[in-house]
Every structure is written in structure tokens, then in C-alpha cells.
């Protein structure tokens, strides 16, 4: 078995106050999650609703599950009973469906709006202009069973650290704009989710509050 405990502490021990670790457990077996759980990790990220559902039913109930992948509206109902946060909301349609399914379970689901800043067509998310438009039009204000907690983005998949830093800085600056204009009175709009195994140290420099780390903790994925 991969030495999950040692790797987890290597990552966590280097994190400054105010930065949370989301341990990305997709495609990893339950025993790896349990090993991290036994070392105190409580927040895990998954990107497939069926895998998440199966894990949530068998693993400890105090785990905080984050959905980090592209989520189709018709799949929200499968994770609505127990998801803590949906990190990649990229359409108003999805936001409304999360609200609808959360209401059925009499709960409020936290979400992050996903930005598409990376120079790759394969990434999902709002452009900065489209995100402004969504917030300006205000339909989201009527949704009482979702709470927008911040922004999320994935930087370009590149070795160019300056490009990564540029994209994350842009996201951080846009967060400040959105916070001041739309969420100034909401202390819970505070999350900036960027940074993965390969670039989380840059992300921390760029004011990330949540890093998504899988490979550095659990090793290569087990498909």
C-alpha cells in the first residue's frame, strides 16, 4: 500500500493557516481514504457521482465530500443528499438544479463558481465576463438552497510557472472584485480554490484557501 500517512503529513505540515487541503480521492480505494482519515483528514474530493455515492455510503459519515469534476445537471440528484460542496458550477442551469435538489433534502449546498482562465479548450467554466454577467443579472439571489462560497479555477497544464502564476493572480484579483461588489456582507464568501499536486505552492502564493491534492498523497490513480 502507498504510504498515505507520510505523504499526507508532508503536504499538510507545509500549509499556512487559512489553507485547507482537499484530498482528491477519485479512483483510489477506500482503504487509502481510511488511511488519510485516520491521520485526521476529513475533506475529500471526488469527480464521478457513482463512485462518490458508493464511497459515501460505506465510509465515515463525518467526511466532508467535495465534488470537483464537471457535473451534469441530471446527475445532481445522486449526490445532493450528502455532498458538502460542489466546486465546479459553470452554468446558471446547474446552479438552479443544485438548488432544486438541495430543497428536496431540506439542506443548503455550498458551491463555487468555476472560472475558465486557462489557455485550454478542454477546461470548463465561466469566462470572467460571463461570470460578471451571471452575478449582475441576479437570478442566483433567488436560490435559497445554494450558497455561493467563492471561486474555483484550474490553471493551464504547463511547466511554465509564470503562466500558472499569472492565471492564479487573475483569479485572485477577480475574487476581490466579486467579493466587493456582490458579497461584501457575506463573510462566508471566502473560498479561492486553485492549486493541485503540481502547482499548489504557487497557488498558496496567489491566495488560494483550498488546494486540491491527490497524486502527492495517494500516488498514481488506480483506474
Per-segment meaning from a language model:
Residues 1-198, 204-206, 218:
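Conserved alpha/beta-domain cores
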Residues 208-223:
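Gly/Pro- and small hydrophobic-enriched strand-loop and loop-to-helix capping segments
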Amino acid at each position: 500500500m502507498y504510504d498515505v500517512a507520510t505523504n499526507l503529513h508532508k503536504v499538510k505540515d507545509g500549509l499556512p493557516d487559512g489553507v485547507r487541503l482537499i484530498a482528491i480521492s477519485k479512483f483510489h480505494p477506500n482503504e487509502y481514504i481510511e488511511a488519510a482519515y485516520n491521520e485526521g483528514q476529513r475533506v475529500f474530493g471526488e469527480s464521478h457521482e457513482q463512485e462518490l455515492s458508493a464511497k459515501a455510503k460505506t465510509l465515515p459519515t463525518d467526511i466532508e465530500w467535495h465534488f470537483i469534476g464537471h457535473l451534469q445537471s441530471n446527475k445532481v440528484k445522486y449526490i445532493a443528499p450528502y455532498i458538502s460542496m460542489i466546486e465546479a458550477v459553470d452554468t446558471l442551469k446547474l446552479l438552479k438544479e443544485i438548488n432544486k435538489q438541495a430543497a428536496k433534502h431540506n439542506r443548503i449546498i455550498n458551491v463555487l463558481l468555476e472560472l475558465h482562465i486557462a489557455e485550454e479548450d478542454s477546461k470548463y467554466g465561466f469566462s470572467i465576463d460571463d461570470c460578471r454577467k451571471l452575478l449582475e443579472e441576479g437570478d442566483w439571489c433567488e436560490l435559497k438552497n445554494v450558497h455561493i462560497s467563492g471561486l474555483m479555477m484550474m490553471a493551464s497544464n504547463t511547466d511554465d510557472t509564470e503562466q500558472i502564476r499569472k492565471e492564479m493572480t487573475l483569479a485572485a484579483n477577480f475574487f476581490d472584485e466579486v467579493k466587493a461588489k456582490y458579497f461584501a456582507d457575506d463573510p462566508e464568501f471566502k473560498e479561492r480554490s486553485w492549486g493541485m499536486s503540481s502547482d499548489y505552492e504557487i497557488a498558496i502564493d496567489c491566495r488560494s484557501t483550498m488546494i486540491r491534492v491527490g497524486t502527492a498523497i495517494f500516488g498514481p490513480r488506480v483506474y
